[in-house]
Amino acid sequence: MSEEFQESDIIFSDQSKISTSSRYTKLYNSRNDEKKGTRRHETAEKTSPVRIPTNNFRCLEWDTTEEEDDKTPPHVIIERRMKEQIAFSACTLKGRDLSRHRNSVLRMTGFLEA
């Protein structure tokens, strides 16, 4: 009679081997740590702490002595540029006007040849 397997036994067969070996490794390492516990404690005391540099760029102060009138905020500059570029039409294009407008745009961009 042949042995019957579950799907998980076939697919995850290597996991069972790893888990038993990892248990042994953990047990082995924990026994060695008990023996070497004093050495690790001594080396931990000898090492110096890690020095983390401070970020001084967060503490910058703005120079407010200059005249504020000369400076224009960036969002105002962008708004002015957008107003210059955009042209509006009050009516919506429908039917034949829309197709003419579409064709003229396609000719200008090079997608349609005249």
UniProtKB/Swiss-Prot annotation:
Residues 23-50 are annotated as: Disordered. It comes from Arabidopsis thaliana. Belongs to the senescence regulator S40 family. It is found in: Cytoplasm. Induction: Slightly induced by dark, abscisic acid (ABA), salicylic acid (SA). Triggered by pathogen attack such as Pseudomonas syringae pv. Tomato DC3000. One of its GO terms (biological process) is leaf senescence. Residues 31-45 have a biased composition (Basic and acidic residues). This is Protein S40-2. Keywords: Cytoplasm. It comes from the Eukaryota. GO terms for cellular component: cytoplasm. Pfam families: Senescence_reg. InterPro entries: Senescence_reg_S40. Its main location: cytoplasm.
